[in-house]
Structures are given as structure tokens and as C-alpha cells.
Amino acid sequence: MILDTDYITEDGRPVIRVFKKENGEFKIEYDRDFEPYIYALLKDDSAIEDVKKITASRHGTTVRVVRAGKVKKKFLGRPIEVWKLYFTHPQDVPAIRDKIREHPAVVDIYEYDIPFAKRYLIDKGLIPMEGDEELKMLAFDIETLYHEGEEFAEGPILMISYADEEGARVITWKKIDLPYVDVVSTEKEMIKRFLKVVKEKDPDVLITYNGDNFDFAYLKKRSEKLGVKFILGRDGSEPKIQRMGDRFAVEVKGRIHFDLYPVIRHTINLPTYTLEAVYEAIFGQPKEKVYAEEIAQAWETGEGLERVARYSMEDAKVTYELGREFFPMEAQLSRLVGQSFWDVSRSSTGNLVEWYLLRKAYERNELAPNKPSGRELERRRGGYAGGYVKEPERGLWENIAYLDFRCHPADTKVIVKGKGVVNISEVREGDYVLGIDGWQKVQRVWEYDYEGELVNINGLKCTPNHKLPVVRRTERQTAIRDSLAKSFLTKKVKGKLITTPLFEKIGKIEREDVPEEEILKGELAGIILAEGTLLRKDVEYFDSSRGKKRVSHQYRVEITVGAQEEDFQRRIVYIFERLFGVTPSVYRKKNTNAITFKVAKKEVYLRVREIMDGIENLHAPSVLRGFFEGDGSVNKVRKTVVVNQGTNNEWKIEVVSKLLNKLGIPHRRYTYDYTEREKTMTTHILEIAGRDGLILFQTIVGFISTEKNMALEEAIRNREVNRLENNAFYTLADFTAKTEYYKGKVYDLTLEGTPYYFANGILTHNSLYPSIIISHNVSPDTLNREGCGEYDEAPQVGHRFCKDFPGFIPSLLGDLLDERQKVKKHMKATVDPIEKKLLDYRQRAIKILANSFYGYYGYAKARWYCKECAESVTAWGRQYIETTMREIEEKFGFKVLYADSVTGDTEVTIRRNGRIEFVPIEKLFERVDHRVGEKEYCVLGGVEALTLDNRGRLVWKKVPYVMRHKTDKRIYRVWFTNSWYLDVTEDHSLIGYLNTSKVKPGKPLKERLVEVKPEELGGKVKSLITPNRPIARTIKANPIAVKLWELIGLLVGDGNWGGQSNWAKYYVGLSCGLDKAEIERKVLNPLREASVISNYYDKSKKGDVSILSKWLAGFMVKYFKDENGNKAIPSFMFNLPREYIEAFLRGLFSADGTVSLRRGIPEIRLTSVNRELSDAVRKLLWLVGVSNSLFTETKPNRYLEKESGTHSIHVRIKNKHRFADRIGFLIDRKSTKLSENLGGHTNKKRAYKYDFDLVYPRKIEEITYDGYVYDIEVEGTHRFFANGILVHNTDGFFATIPGADAETVKKKAREFLNYINPKLPGLLELEYEGFYRRGFFVTKKKYAVIDEEGKITTRGLEIVRRDWSEVAKETQARVLEAILRHGDVEEAVRIVKEVTEKLSKYEVPPEKLVIHEQITRELKDYKATGPHVAIAKRLAARGIKVRPGTVISYIVLKGSGRIGDRTIPFDEFDPTKHRYDAEYYIENQVLPAVERILKAFGYKKEDLRYQKTRQVGLGAWLKMGKK
């Protein structure tokens, strides 16, 4: 594995160094033969001798071209000949390049600014980070002494902390008595100790957080001052600090310095990027912050040093955890881009694309364009036209799937599995069609109306822009390229088409209506041939009733298969039941992995014998399917299907070979001889190899089991198409092409996997979801290319792009997208969790790179910068959005008023491919499949969300997609306890429950389920919904397994395991205390008797026991501890049966749970200091239907009279009766107490008859947030559980038909949905969400509507923050009522004038004028002094403590001067002494609250306020009528 490269100089010549890790060892390789070079384009080749004579000086050395050679290259796709100029040393190039460029014969020079070591990686085709080496990582952090005003590194380093897989430690030079702290004598000794640690541990990766700009520079400067050689490099060098733009970057030779800070800044959006904020954002866990002044105070006073040391240790530990989280992604990007991890982790997305393009340009012999000069850079920064703007909407639209017609007419023939040859118009989504990889699933069928020219190629008709793969052979290679159909009409297409001669044959086989009986007979014959035995036995016995001997004729059919072959076993049972009406008996021998099916009936035996005698005349595919399922396998190494038979079974191979020949499936036979007990034995082998043979086997025969069929698919995918002639499946064909006119429907398919399928026997390209760049071939080398047969012209801007050949960048982007699909398919198929995770990182890296391409065109510093390309992509995006909006308006008479969505982000409960997960919603968003405006969509497969139906039942509903976008809306945090909250956007709806007598008994539940915005909570809706019904599957539990899970629960609560001692290999420890005898009787003894544990022994007199069980010791270490050694609950437990989860919880609560009465109310809780563990327990409780909550003690725990640094976290049981019924306690004393406490209490909540419980918001606050917000589409209910709370999801737009009645609008809306949805890409669909009888729209994010039931919904107009007075809120609410409920705008204006008049006359009660604002930071940190801050400072001066979080309530008084000087606390307001400032409240409170509403109707501010002269403003004359 290559870690990095650089070069050194020996005897004036460069020597490349390659830093590598091989077989666990670090090494440096040297290359002394690589020469620096540049390219020069000359006007006249004869001038090369003059160029070679040019000289320059570098450090007293004369620099010149040492040799030159003419080479053929391409520049923007056009052939060009340039001179390759070689030099002695890389530094010669910058010394001489300008002189060469200025020579009159030189047109330009190229690739003169590619760093030498990077050039080496490109030219040699070397890929950093490639390989499976396990890299050692070490993170470190420093704490320093700093006082305000000091110079950088003036203060000493106080602590150096480091962390790796063995844990975290702190080195310091003051006495601190903590187990993880190493104390030395001085700062100098501390630095030397750290350097020794790095040398001894010898990490491959050093992880820091902002180490580029702080830690390394500080350490180096202090080392210089203290006389310490700061050597960290594996070559004995000190870290190299270099400038990179406006930042620094630090290299450590031979080690990767991974600075997390630039990576995280590029990866996630956060309001602040402190280590604490990042850790909480990534892992959801808070981390304490100790500020510089606190560190200084602790160091100088000696008080609180333990806290600083803990903080320092946690800094290193957190940095290490973050490093482990982000390293794999950056490693994959490094591999993908082909540059070092160090470079890639510090690169912008534009630079990532650039380095990728440079490598691909070299591979394709393309000459890279130059970077812009300073003047050119300024010109480029002039910008280009933005995205489509529909007033009031604004947005930049990129990579929108354009509905390009690349299709076939309706009568084009394809082969569908189980149907045979059918018209393409008859194909349905979910069908399997014959493709290049055999059977391939149809994801989407595309249908369009078309009128125009079709190209007929060998009988296959397609639209001119459709693509067909063409094989072109040269002496060196066989290349497959996609060519446009229209290109076949010219002489530009060289090569042959790929066809299959078996098109009709496979179609006929699939179309054959073979009776099921014949199929089952064939499969049974194949199974018996492979795995069966027909037994006939005569047994002599004495018949006592007749007094003579008799003979019993016994007949038996036996089939033996593997115990794990469940699909095979089910098929065998089905065959016997259908053919013979009997169910086989099943036997399993002890200590074997085999199951034998037996049928002992003469009539069955005779019929099976008859079937076997005619095996060669049975349905051949069925016979082979049965045989290969029994005796065949897929060799994953050789990628073949193979059968082995012993010495005496050659005849079986003969039978199978004849049947394969009958079907035309190529195969080979060979033998393998070996010696066993001095006797020569022979294995007969039959193997189906080659892609053609495998595909024929798959399409005609296949396996019975899903597992083997998937293995076969994988083998086919991994088989190269390396022989396209003279094989059984593919043939190459010459072509003829002509055109014809066509009017009608055209179709295309989107397939899973490789994008090709057979149509009319010819391989054709399938439709993808192309980006604009790919579909329109947008590239600098295709821009306005002369001499092309066909162009795509960008709308509005008029730039034309040649479609005759794939552009450089579109082809690379297409390759990336194809590669990502392959990786994702492989990821889906693999069962290895490590491989799956690596593949996930790979596909995400590809996504990051691919999504960067559009921005690259507009990146002013880019080599392949193309303003015209960027403008064109944007223009096509504008056209797509305009077309969509225009179609709803023109074809259906709608007027689009506003289109937007509401979203939320948090953890959701899903079921993915049948497995339950609790996953952050952003993790569901793996890629951008589609963009519509500023929204991005990721299409999901196999994902369901837990939701609630209208009958109050928990159900799983399909999630077609997840959506995200940026937002400037306010984000509210709704707190349910001090540790349980939900973050939602201001207009996101939660599902509230009306637990009120206003809803009549017996009414449907849906009348109680209401949508409520965050700011509406606490009004009529006071309770929200949380799950309260089991969703885990149930089984008939094994009693011993129940006991085992009870023991594991006890261990997680009160056990200990793991470590390096010999004891830890064989034992786990359990503290039983006074309950030891009961635990022995109920758990340990039954497990010992069942041999689950070997034994247990007393460890102490306090009830501690050691449990002997090597497997259990290993199991607990592997699954129930995290990487930091803390107790953990593995995610696989979320998919255990309900009975085992309950057993685990029973053991856990018996160990760490308590039961008590608090204020007469029963209380059950589990207490821990481990937040991750507590969160997992909550999820397990939800799975078994026990509602719960979580809260954290605010006071830290104490141990030996000292604060321990931990806080108790309590999981509280809400549904106590279900807990008692299903979980309870193992310990009698706790069970008795629980029973006593619950004796007089019942579950009184009305909601308990449904599948949910109620939870009550305690506090709502606005938070700062700058990231993406997310939403998921849930089919049917539009609800899902987020952080255990039921919320609503929506994603829609508003439209109306002016003048139409309600029913017409509703009808036309549904017609539009039926029209537009087939045109939308993927699973993206519009739905009819509701009808609003009136509404108005101010801007794209400000509107108000009222529905048919009179409910008003607003967005962007609400004034719910504390800094709005009641008079402003009340006035706005009345204005909205007047406009929406009564449709009277003039009434709304009268209301505003009335309020402003009352304010002017001091008739408004002072309590309606109070403004509330919160102090959010320390007072000394405020630079601007607002009114609330001014009051706070005055209060503080009077000795009143004002802390962050304090709410200041004030009134603004009449007077002159600054507002802050005229505010007083409300409780000091005296109406007899004070007068409020009426003008302030009119101008700054009331009018701003209503002005943004009424300006939509033509009113201005001066039209709205009370005026004694009653003058009417011009705006009033221009106002719109009633709406």
C-alpha cells in the first residue's frame, strides 16, 4: 500500500521516494530514473534546436533542455503533435519555462506545473491507499497556557494527550493523580516522552484536529525554544510545515498526517466547528468544553487539574474516534482520484476533479489545458447566468434528468423470463429481460410519444440518439464502444454489432407452457441422480400367526441434503406432495450436517423408478436444475459452475453432459487422479466455464435455491467479456442502416446492473437516469465542434454540443456512475460486513467526485474550465423546470402559486429488507438520484418506516425516497425531558393527540390525531405520540435460550469480562450480591445442566461468581463491548425475537433497575452512566412494546466525596403494567415490590387502547442550524417516528385555476398527477395532498392558506419569537383571519389602523407591549448592545446575577436617545410614571408584522397606520381585490 511519495536530490538529480506499507512492514522504495518534463507546441518543428539552446540559471547552475522528442497527443479531442522537453531536475522547470514560452516559435507550453511526485503517480499508474494493509493510527492533542495578548507559542504546553486502539493517555509535568496520566518533570521532558511514544508505537497515521494550523506549529516552536529535536518522520526528519492557500499544512514523512478539520469542514455543515460541536454532530454525544481561561486558572492554582486532564484525554480520544470514522472515506477518495491521502484530505472538490481528470487525460493521451493566468482568472470570475427563476422562486438547477428520447418503437422484441419473446411495450417493471449479464431486472419502463425519423439497423429500429454497443478489434485489443444510432448512417462507426443467435431459442424455452407435472418430474429425477437412493430390500421374518417364515418386500426413496439448504428442502417436500400426495419423513443424524428425506411406499418407489428409467427423455432444463442444485456448485474463485463425481459415478457425468449438449450449453469434462489407501481413485469433473456458458445455464436452467442463483449472477458479472466470437451465446455481426418515418409510442428500459439488453436479438443500450452533462454530451471538446452530424443545442444560450462521439468529461462521468452502480450491486450481494462497509465507502466516494463535476465547469481555476458548458447545464435545468411548470399551467389550466417542502432531521425507525434499524435520517440519504430545484432526492429500495395508521395501529409502510435541502427557516428543539428532544423546522408538523372532552366519545381516532406546528404546542394540543406496542417478531422460545439471554442481561448490568489475563479467556464475572442463591437457582444451574456454561465458582464472599464458559467469554467481548471497552448493546439484538429481548431486559433490570414509589406513583427505572447503552435499552423497550422516556441528573455523581465526572442517566418506564406482564424482574424482592406498587394503579390513559403512548413537551426553543434538513416519503400515512415521536411528512406545491370552482380544481389536479408522474424520474411522484379554499403568497417562503375545515396554515409569516410583543402577534393573527376566513382585505387594513390608533392614544394595556429576549452568552462577550443586553448589564451592575439563558422582559419608553437607554424591565413599569413609546411599537412591532402580508395586495406602510387627516395613500388605490 502506497502511503505517499516525494523526491529528494542526490548528486543534482531527483530521486523519487515511495513510502509504502507491505506485509505489515513500512518501507521506502527509490526510483532514480524518472525525469521531469513539459510539453511545447511549436509553430515550426525546425525551431526545436533553438528551444534546446535556451538557458536559465538556478542557484548558480545553468538550466537547459537535456533532450526532446516529438509525440502525438490529443487536445480537447483533436489530434495534435507536441514536443516533450526533458530536464535534469524538477526545479529546472519553473526556472526556464517562461523563457521557453516567450520564444517566438513557441505557441504555448503545457503540463509545466504538475508537481514531480504527483506526476510520477500519474505516469506510473500507481494508486495510493490500494491494498488491504491494516494501518496503525494514533491521535494526539495538546493543552497550552494562554493569557490574553500573548504571542503564539509564548506560553508552555501543559499536556500532550494521545489515543489509539489501546486507549487514551495524558502526559503532563504537574502532579495529577489519575490512572491515565503520566507525570514527567518538565515541559521539555514531556515533549521528549511524546516523541518516544510515537517512535515506539510507530503509527502509520497521525490524527489531529486542526493540527495543520495549531498543534504541530506550537509543538515545533516550543521544541526549538527548549532545544528538542522534533523528529517525527520515519526518515528521521522533522514535520514540514508549508502554506496551502490561506492555511498551513503539515507533512510527516513516512506517516500520513490526517488533519480532520479541513475534511469535516468540507463534509458536514455546522454552525460551529469546535471539536465538541463536531463530536456531538457525528456521534450524538455531548463533550465537555474547558475554556482557555479555565485551563490557565487550574494550572496556576492547582485546583481543577483533574478536570483539565480528563478534558485533554477526551480530546485525544474523540479525535481518534472521529479519525476512525472519516478515514475510510478519504482513503477511498485517494484511491479514486489517484493522489495521496495527505493531498486529497486537504483538497477542494474542484481540485479532486482536476486530479482525477489529469490522471484520466494521461491514460487517454489527452494533453491537459493550462491553469488560467491572473488576467484570465479575473475574466472567468465574471460569472454566468444562474438557474431558472419562477417568481418568487429562486434556485440553481443542476444535473436534472432530461427526458431525452432514446428509445425503440412498440413492436421491438425482447425476451422476458417466463413470457418468452414479447413486444417491448408489454414489458412491466419487475420483469426480468435477457441482457448482457443474463436475466436482468427491469427497474423502469419509459414510454413517450414520438414523431420523426427512426434508424433501422439490421432490423432493430431506434430513435437517432439511441446507443448501441459496437465491438472494434485491433491488433492490440478488443474495445466495446457505445455509438449513436444516427452514426450508423455514416461511415464513422467501425466495428460490429453484438448479437445472440439464441434469441429465438431462449424465447421459445421461456414461452413453452410446460406442465408443472413435467417440471417436477424432471427436477425430481435430477435430484435423485445427484443426492438420492432407491432402495428395495427383502427381509425374511417369522409370521407367528401363521406359523411360518415370510418375506417382507421393503421399498424406500431417500434424498440427503445439507441442513442449511432450506430452499432445496422446501422444494423436495413440495415435489413429493404434488406428484405423489405424500410428505416425506425427515431424519437428521447426530453430529452431522445432513438431513435425509424418506418415503417408504411401494407405489411411490415404483413411480420414481419409472421416472428415473426415462430420465433422458424428461424436460431437460428441469432435470439439470435438480441435479445441479444437488451436486453442483458455483466456484467463486474460478467463476464457474462445477460438478464432481467419484470413481464409480462417471455414468452420471455422461447423463448430464448429454442433456447439456441437447440444450447447447458449452461445458468441459476432465478427471483428477489421486491415491487413497494405496489405491488410485478418480474424480470426474464437469465444468461450465466462460461467460457464454454461464449465461446460457442461467437463462435456460438455473438453480432452485436463491443463494446459488445469486452466486451464479455474481460469477457472470465478474466474468470479463473477453471472447465475443465463436462462442455459444454471443456473435458479432456486420450491419446495414437506413431510415424510416414513424409516429407513435417509443419505449426504453432501465435495468439493474450492466446497462445493455437484447432487442430483436441485437444488444442495445438501456436508458439511464442521465445527468444533463452525460445526456447532452456537455464537454469542452464537444462544444461547437465543427463537422458534426448531430448537435444538442442548449436552450436560451445557444451553445451546441457534438453528439457524434462521447466527450472527455461526459464519458468519464458516465464511467463513474456505471462504476458506482456496480459497486452498489456488489455491496448488496455481499454478506461480509467488512467488505460491505468498504464498498459503501467506495460508492460514497464516487458519489462525492461525480457530484463535483458540474461545479467544476464553473470553477474559475479549473484547467477544463468552460463557461459555455456551465451556462448550458444551467439552461437545460431551467428548461426542465419551466416545462414542468408550464405543462401544469397550459395543459391543465393551473396557475402555480408556490412550490416548496417542509423537512426534519433526526433518527428514524425503519425496516430495511426485513431487518429493523434505528438510523439517522441523513444516513438514509446515500446519493443524489434526482434534483428538483433546491431539493435533492435519494431513491430507496427495500426500506419501510414504522408509522401509525388511522386506527391507531403501528404498521410498516414503504419509503420510496428520502429528500433533503438547505433551509433558512427557523429550527425548533422540542424537549420532552432534559435528555430527549426532537429538532424540527418551524413549519414541520408533529402529530398531536387531542386528549380532551371536546372530542365526543366513539368518534374515530383520526379526529383526535391532529397536525400541530412546534409553536402551537401547549395550546389545544398538549400531548404527542410515542410507540407502545411490540414490533419485534415472536417465536416459540427455547427455555434454555431464555435463561441465556437473562444471564447476558445480568452480565451487562452487573458483570465484567474481557482483558488480557488468562482468566478473561475462559471466565466472565457476575456480581450477584444478596441475590446470589436466587440467581444460581433460576439462571446459572439450568444453564450448567444444559451445558451452556461449564460451571461457576465463588469469587468472593460478597456474592461475586466466576462463570466458566470460553465461548461466552468470547461472545461478550466480541459483541457487548465497544472499541473503547465500554459496555454496549449490539445492533443485531434489534432483530432478535421478542421473547429473547424481554429475557435480556429482565436480566438487565434485575441487575441495574429499581422499583419505587415517588409521590405515590410507581416508578421503574434503569440507571447507568453510559448514554449509548441507555439509548439502546430504550430501543429494545420500544421493540417489545414498552413506552419509556429518558432523563439525566444535572448534578454529577460523586465518589469518595469527589465528583466522578459522570452523570446518572435514567431510562424510565411509562407502560409499567406491560413491563410487569412481559419483562418484570428475576429477583423476588423486586418482583414483590413491583406488584405491591402497581396493585392500586391502572393504565388510565385513553391512548393505551391503541398502539401508542403520550408524551408531553416540556420546553420549546429555537436553535442555530445551518445544515441540510431531511424528510422521507411514507406511503399511505405520511407519518413516521422521529426520535420516538410521531411526525408528519410532506413535500408539495400549491396551484390553482383562476375562476374555477373547488370541484373543478380538485378534478384537474388529479388529472395532472396522472399525466406528470410517468414523466418524473425514478420513484419520484407528485401526490394530491389537500385542497385549500383560499390563500396568498408573498414570497417563495412566505405564504398563508386556509383549508376546507377552516384551519389556517402559514409559513414564513409567523412571529412567534420572544422579541415580538403580544400586540404585534395579536394584530397579525386578526389580519390573517380577515383575509383568509372572510376574504376581506379591507377589513384587515381597518384592523391595523385601529390598533395603530389605540397605540397612538395609549389605549393598549402595557402587558401587551412586553418584549422577551434571552441572554445567550456571557455579557462580556456581547459586542453589540441591544435593549435586553443593556438592561442585563444594568442589572448585573446592581449585583443581580445574569447568566446565559436568562430571559429579559422589557418595555420601551417614550423619550429620546438610544432604544437601549429607554428600556426598563416590565416589573419596574409604572403606568403613573412611565409612558411607552407608541411610535416604536407602531414602526418596529405592529407594522412589520402585517406589512409583509398586506404588501401582497398592493398596500404600503403609509397606507396602514392611523392618520388624523385620513389621507389615503396611492398604494390603497392600487390594491388588488378580494381573493
UniProtKB/Swiss-Prot annotation:
GO terms for molecular function: DNA binding; DNA-directed DNA polymerase activity; endonuclease activity; nucleotide binding. Spliced protein is a DNA polymerase used in PCR reactions. SMART domains: HintC (SM00305), HintN (SM00306), POLBc (SM00486). Residues 524-665, 1047-1186 form the DOD-type homing endonuclease domain. Belongs to the DNA polymerase type-B family. This protein undergoes a protein self splicing that involves a post-translational excision of the two intervening regions (inteins) followed by peptide ligation. It catalyses: DNA(n) + a 2'-deoxyribonucleoside 5'-triphosphate = DNA(n+1) + diphosphate. This is DNA polymerase. It comes from Thermococcus fumicolans. InterPro entries: DNA-dir_DNA_pol_B, DNA-dir_DNA_pol_B_exonuc, DNA-dir_DNA_pol_B_multi_dom, DNA/RNA_pol_sf, DNA_pol_B_thumb, DNA_pol_palm_dom_sf, DNA_pol_type-B, Hint_dom_C. One of its GO terms (biological process) is intron homing. Gene3D superfamilies: DNA polymerase family B, C-terminal domain, DNA Polymerase, chain B, domain 1, Hedgehog/Intein (Hint) domain, Helix hairpin bin, Homing endonucleases, Palm domain of DNA polymerase, Ribonuclease H-like superfamily/Ribonuclease H.
